[in-house]
Amino acid sequence: MVVSIELTDKIDYTKKPLTLAEQVARLKQRGLVFDDESEATAYLFNISYYRLRAYTYPFQENGEDSEHTFTRKDIHFKDIIDLYCFDRRLRSLIFNTIEKIEVAVRTKIVQVYAESTGDSHWFNDESLYRFGYDDLMDRIDADVNRSNEDFIKHYNSKYDNPSMPPSWMALEVVSFATLSRLFQSLRLDSRKEYITEQFGLKKVAILENWLHSISNLRNCCAHHSRVWNRRFMVSVILPYNTLYPFMDRTTIGQIRTNKLFAV
């Protein structure tokens, strides 16, 4: 008989919660400068120590057994707050820009496929997809059922077949992640290539990658997550050859493709 023994280095979590005063004291001990501790306490009560930790991290020693001491003696708590506020404004600008991209992508996919198939419910046609049909239908169904839009309620109250609303309704309410998955799952044909060209790209795979990357960035913005100095899970493909050149080869070669600037 073979006995399987699972080895683990995990330990119990024993850290205790800190009061606001203790949080200030902890940061002071590590070298952060406070000009007004009462004001800092108010910020910590509104923003949280843990959320701000992401903005102090780059200025601290962060080795395995380090004390997370600040590497510079001139970093003030106000500098961290300024960085946090900058990131918040940056997220707002990014989110507004993504809105334009998202609306354009939804519109083009729906219009091109509805027009070419003559089918209001074309997205239900399994023959249009190269993989992931069942999972995609589950995602679309869940997103539509979760929607509180009046036009979805109107369709459900008036029609019983097909059970799903037409593409211009259903794909209007699915998440951008679901929309990205739909585009990626579609078979490669002239319609998909045409949509890609509308965004100035020559390769469908690049638009698929961009939609996936933008979807991740959108989620960060929507959930108020840090975007400054973040390493994203999906690396962006930066093409050298586009319909409308926007960056020279040297610059492209210097960009870290899992950082915000690439997205």
Predicted regions and their residues:
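Long, contiguous internal "core" modules enriched in hydrophobic/ aromatic residues
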Residues: 2-263
